[in-house]
Amino acid sequence: NETEVDSDVTIPTPISGQLMNLSQVNDQTFSSGSVGQGFAIKPSDGKILAPFDATVRQVFTTRHAVGLVGDNGVVLLIHIGLGTVKLKGTGFVSYVEQGQRVKKGQELIEFWDPTIKKAGLDDTVIVVITNSDKFSDFDMMMKAGQNVQAEDNVLELKAKNEEESAIGGGQVEPAN
């Protein structure tokens, strides 16, 4: 069943830290946009909050990532760090399970940053819209390099109209 997409959606950051463009992420899979459009955060704490009211679609057994389906129609993947699947859940606590309803601002996952760093891994938190093809425009509302607090709005999405839906996904426009 297809999620109904709201016409315009703003995506807040689920974590505090320094805003990065997805293209700056040190992983082709994410930086190329093939998983979806979005943004990344160099975290300043270890709390991942729900960016909007949603249903938890998936919690990875290793707790380093969570998938949400928002009431706004956005399907979101929040991925903590690069290569962190190797940690097998060490340093990560999940507060939610698959199918659970969550409210905006509710804590989803907590992670201990030193565990990631000690393992020599990148702690960048990646936020991607996996149903990016439903949207025509992705506009960053803040510049990369800015410090953001959890729940600050950072990305604006515009839903496609019917004709555009046939064409494919748009690209992220940088903030000017």
Model-identified regions with their sequence ranges:
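Contiguous, well-folded functional domains in the mature portion of proteins
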Residues: 1-176
